[in-house]
Amino acid sequence: MEKFTDLNYTLSVITLMNSTLHTILEDPGMAYFPYIASVLTVLFTLHKASIPTMKIALKTSKCSYKVVKYCIVTILNTLLKLAGYKEQITAKDEIEKQMDRVVKEMRRQLEMIDKLTTREIEQVELLKRIYDKLIVRSTGEIDMTKEINQKNVRTLEEWESGKNPYEPKEVTAAM
């Protein structure tokens, strides 16, 4: 039953708006019709949206002051947006929430910076150790006899039997 009453009320308001607009349109000097129609539409929408919302919110909420304040702030922010302003009205609670969020984000960033700094220090220490191992040290004169295997080269007099062991020998094979 309440819905039918609400529907009748809405229809009567729309009829009232239409009759008002028709009387305005009959006046040929009226050049601001679109603006007036927009304002009336916004006001009607706000009226229809805010009153039931406020009733429900006040019935279900234990803290009606906060609900009323939030609804008023929301309505004012909507009107400011419609007027073209980018600024918004914020409640004190919202400012505190935003500050807490900013502080939390700053703490997270500081922890991240601390971790990255620690990793960078560890990487620098590792690079220093690698560099120290790769550093070229001069040892002075290098003994090249080991490189070309000249220590095992013997002359004919140094061989034990006096024969060259690398000369081919006559080999016989069994058939």
Swiss-Prot record:
Q: How does it assemble?
A: Homotetramer. Interacts with the immature particle in the viroplasm. Interacts with host CAV1, early and late in infection. Interacts with host integrin ITGA1/ITGB1 heterodimer. Interacts with host integrin ITGA2/ITGB1 heterodimer. Interaction with microtubules blocks trafficking to the Golgi apparatus.
Cross-referenced InterPro entries: Rotavirus_NSP4
Q: How does it sit in the membrane?
A: Single-pass type III membrane protein
What is the annotated localization of this protein? Host rough endoplasmic reticulum membrane; Host membrane, Host caveola; Secreted
> Which comment does the entry carry about domains?
Binds 1 calcium ion per tetramer.
Keywords attached to this Swiss-Prot or TrEMBL record, sorted alphabetically, are:
Activation of host autophagy by virus, Calcium, Enterotoxin, Glycoprotein, Host endoplasmic reticulum, Host membrane, Host-virus interaction, Ion channel, Ion transport, Membrane, Metal-binding, Secreted, Signal-anchor, Toxin, Transmembrane, Transmembrane helix, Transport, Viral ion channel, Virulence
Role:
Plays an essential role in the virus replication cycle by acting as a viroporin. Creates a pore in the host endoplasmic reticulum and as a consequence releases Ca(2+) in the cytoplasm of infected cell. In turn, high levels of cytoplasmic calcium trigger membrane trafficking and transport of viral ER-associated proteins to viroplasms, sites of viral genome replication and immature particle assembly. The secreted form acts as an enterotoxin that causes phospholipase C-dependent elevation of the intracellular calcium concentration in host intestinal mucosa cells. Increased concentration of intracellular calcium disrupts the cytoskeleton and the tight junctions, raising the paracellular permeability. Potentiates chloride ion secretion through a calcium ion-dependent signaling pathway, inducing age-dependent diarrhea.
Q: Which family does it belong to?
A: Belongs to the rotavirus NSP4 family.
Organism of provenance: Rotavirus A (strain RVA/Human/Japan/S2/1980/G2P1B[4]) (RV-A)
Identify the residue ranges that face the Lumenal compartment according to the record.
1-28
Post-translational modification, briefly?
A: The N-glycosyl content is primarily Man(9)GlcNAc, with a small amount of Man(8)GlcNAc.
Q: Which GO terms describe its cellular component?
A: extracellular region; host caveola; host cell rough endoplasmic reticulum membrane; membrane
Which stretches of this protein does UniProt put in the Cytoplasmic compartment? 52-175
Which residues carry a glycan? N8, N18
Give the transmembrane region(s): 29-51
List the protein's name. Non-structural glycoprotein 4
Which positions bind Ca(2+)?
Answer: E120, Q123
- Source taxon at top rank: Viruses
Q: Name one GO biological process term.
A: viral process
